């Protein structure tokens, strides 16, 4: 199977149909493709591949002027480039293979470490992975070649670090094999897209080709990224021959294109597609030594000391609550800010922003998050970002009050949730109410974005509470509280009023 000519990428076409596209189709027919039809972490990996091909085909763009002029010539340039490098995109065969290192051999004659290709799908219940989307356990699954291609690419971008098998790469031990030559499990670091469960963000265009163009980063911007020395070349052009291939390893780890499509794991697929040889590959520095262009860097003060951190995804906090950080243009804040592609946007027009992440706890994959938001141009300036942050803060303060109100209600009905042995139940009751609140608040997100664009003054919390967003937050909290706290009996009603006073302390009449 060749990724340039065989269909393997699930996409949504403009006619509404979902069909697989070839890598060449992505560029030549990209104006007919509305969007990708994949999971969040797969989207991130695929977009990185598309951007890598586009940059390599253009050998740039060097600056903003080149970026503005390159869209028209991108389809032909990418088509010619993929024809030239087509042999590097073979999934199987005796020659060069896509994202598979050469001359990889098992550490011992009968190596039973990690043979199943199901290890490539982090959503399956295999090894240490929890079941996210899978209902059938066990190894030995068979995957069609088109799915294997996507799994391989995504695994190289997101594989969590930890214990891993070992192998010989051109007769040399794979990185992390500390017991060499004794065959024992090795160690690996996170692949470059995973550290900190970072949120990735990409501005979205009218079609897939426009999205690719919108996310191209100029060479003069690339070299400002920590840990990046140059635009570089894709890893398939300079595939390291062994762990000692310093020149090609430097390209893979310290250049923009080398990192976009990584080889974080040393992999060799069996010809039948059921098994693989898997070991640690190339170690990629992460923040603060290196930064991904799609990540957001924020300033956070801990113990009185401000420092810069990668903005992380959370299963308890939807991405829309971080939009004020995600939309800061990096050009305006040294080392901090949102994705570099924001600098390509017209500051006078609204835009769509896709945000997503694979969330992990150390080596354990937990789940994915994603969201698509229609963002007003006002969010690209500090005044709009601050106003949005104030609106989110109002909601977060209300959510915290809701949790305390639920606890007070239960205390008044004789259910003391502040006892140490009741902690888990208290958290469950509070989180259930908070989940309902945040779900309703997110449905009304356009009201918050409208407040960002509004000329109405919102100088303080009282003004925010009188706004359309403030009324929505109030109503969402009231409904969530009523659902969580029954108020039918006399005692329940008294407890309900006591809790309501916690939720809305300044309300003249808590019973309304």
Q: How should each PLM-predicted stretch be described?
A:
Residues 1-127, 159-160, 164-165, 170-512:
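Extended alpha-helical scaffolding segments
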């Amino acid at each position: 199977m060749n990724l340039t000519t065989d269909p393997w990428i699930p996409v949504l076409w403009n006619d509404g149909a979902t069909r697989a596209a070839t890598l060449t189709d992505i560029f030549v027919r990209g104006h007919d493709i509305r969007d990708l039809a994949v999971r969040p972490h797969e989207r991130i990996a695929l977009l990185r591949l598309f951007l890598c091909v586009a940059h390599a085909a253009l050998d740039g763009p060097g600056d903003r002027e080149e970026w503005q002029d390159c869209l028209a010539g991108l389809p032909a340039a990418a088509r010619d480039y993929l024809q030239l490098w087509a042999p590097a995109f073979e999934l199987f065969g005796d020659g060069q293979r896509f994202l598979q290192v050469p001359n990889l051999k098992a550490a011992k004659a009968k190596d039973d470490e990690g043979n199943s290709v199901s290890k490539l799908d982090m959503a399956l219940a295999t090894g240490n992975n929890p079941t996210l989307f899978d209902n059938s356990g066990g190894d030995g699954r068979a995957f069609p070649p088109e799915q294997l291609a996507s799994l391989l690419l995504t695994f190289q971008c997101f594989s969590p670090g930890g214990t891993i098998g070992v192998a010989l790469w051109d007769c040399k031990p794979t990185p992390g094999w500390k017991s060499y030559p004794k065959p024992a499990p090795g160690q690996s670091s996170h692949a470059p897209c995973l550290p900190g469960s970072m949120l990735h963000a990409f501005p979205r265009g009218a079609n897939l080709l426009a999205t690719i163009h919108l996310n191209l980063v100029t060479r003069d911007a690339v070299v400002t990224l920590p840990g990046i020395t140059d635009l570089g070349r894709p890893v398939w052009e300079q595939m390291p021959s062994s762990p000692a291939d310093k020149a090609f390893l430097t390209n893979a780890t310290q250049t923009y294109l080398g990192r976009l499509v990584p080889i974080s794991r040393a992999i060799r697929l069996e010809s039948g597609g059921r098994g693989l040889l898997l070991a640690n590959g190339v170690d990629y520095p992460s923040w603060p030594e290196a930064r991904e262009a799609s990540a957001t860097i924020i300033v956070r003060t801990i113990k009185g000391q401000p420092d810069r951190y990668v903005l992380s995804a959370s299963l308890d906090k939807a991405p829309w609550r971080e939009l004020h950080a995600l939309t800061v243009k990096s050009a305006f804040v040294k080392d901090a800010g949102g994705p570099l592609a924001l600098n390509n946007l017209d500051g006078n027009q609204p835009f769509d922003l896709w945000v997503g992440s694979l969330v992990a706890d150390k080596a354990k994959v937990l789940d994915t998050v994603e969201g698509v938001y229609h963002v007003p141009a006002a969010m690209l300036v500090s005044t709009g970002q601050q106003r949005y942050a104030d609106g989110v803060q109002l909601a977060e303060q209300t959510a915290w009050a809701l949790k305390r109100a639920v606890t007070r209600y239960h205390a008044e009905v004789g259910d003391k949730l502040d006892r140490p042995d009741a902690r888990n139940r208290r958290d469950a009751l509070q989180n259930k109410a908070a989940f309902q609140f945040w779900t309703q608040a997110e449905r009304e997100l356009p009201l918050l974005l409208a407040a960002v664009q509004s000329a109405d003054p919102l100088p303080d919390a009282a003004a925010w509470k009188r706004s359309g967003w403030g009324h929505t937050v109030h109503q969402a909290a009231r409904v969530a509280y009523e659902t969580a706290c029954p108020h039918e009996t006399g005692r329940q009603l008294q407890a309900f009023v006591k809790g309501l006073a916690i939720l809305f302390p300044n309300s003249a009449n808590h019973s309304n």
